[in-house]
Amino acid sequence: MIGITLAFVLWVVGSVVVTVLIYDATFARYEREEKPVPAALEPLVADRRAVTFSSGDNTLAGYVYGDGGDMLVVMAPGYHACVDDYLWQIQHFLDSGYGVFVFDTTGSCHSEGESAVGFSQAVWDLDSALTFAEKSGLFGYRRVALFGHSRGGYAVCCALAAHEVAAVISVAGVNSAMEGVMEPAAARVGFVAYGNYPFLWLYQAWLFDAETVSLSAADCIAQSDTPVLIVHGKNDDAVELDGGSIYAHRAEIDAPQVDFLVWDTPQQDGHSDLLFDADGTENEALMTYICQFLEQNSKGK
């Protein structure tokens, strides 16, 4: 009996250690060399306004594009993504009459933070960004809409629980923090990954809190009356369409103001390539669809 108990204790301790080591390595700080800005986007970069704001103990770096007007689009970037990864999408929003506020998340690129912490950190960072924007008078804009990609697509839906916004666009969004971590783990090691599920949940609850880790994008959408557009690539191999995506939980969202769009254009139906055309510019058709959704469905027009 003592041997069984000892073996169990050793298994628990070993599982906790392995979980923490792998998790912390996965969400290590992300930095990279600056990419050259395409000549067509140099005026966009030259005219943007740099801002900083606090998220917890860290100072985050962001940019405001535009000088005021009707609607500000606050963008939440994906995991291992920086502000400049979305310059073509930002330009499209500006050309369509919207302002944009976007930022580097904790532990990424130009923002402070020793690590990216986890999926839930995107929720906290976006909450801090929205609070900062609200206290700044939305930088001269009347309304705010949200656009998020990947981890950011999860965060913008969770923001519905705490902020009044005109509309939400989620692209390639994961449904929950646990699904965001478990899906790639299971893809690598199979069903055995679920043996560490309780330790992973407890570690994230310790890093954040149980309420935040338990947030589900589908639940937040279902409890809101805000228009939401969920976009997902048919062949997304990072957040699978019928796996941990928000789209996979569509049956839990019984709301007429929510639209679902599966993007199936070849070579543009993955996790990130759905945002771009073959020449590296924005996916013109998708961005036009998104802007039309904002024009036709947003609250407070």
Model-found features: residue ranges?
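An N-terminal hydrophobic leader/cap segment in hydrolases
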Residues: 2-54, 61-63
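C-terminal catalytic histidine-bearing segment of alpha/beta-hydrolase fold enzymes
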Residues: 255-301
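Short alpha-helix in the alpha/beta-hydrolase fold that links the catalytic acid
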Residues: 226, 240-250
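Short beta-strand/loop motif that positions the catalytic acidic residue
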Residues: 224, 230-232, 236
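Gly/Ser-rich "nucleophile elbow"/oxyanion-hole loop immediately N-terminal to the catalytic nucleophile
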Residues: 131-150
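Conserved alpha/beta-hydrolase
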Residues: 90-112
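Alpha/beta-hydrolase active-site loop
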Residues: 116-137
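Hydrolase active-site cap/lid region
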Residues: 158-210
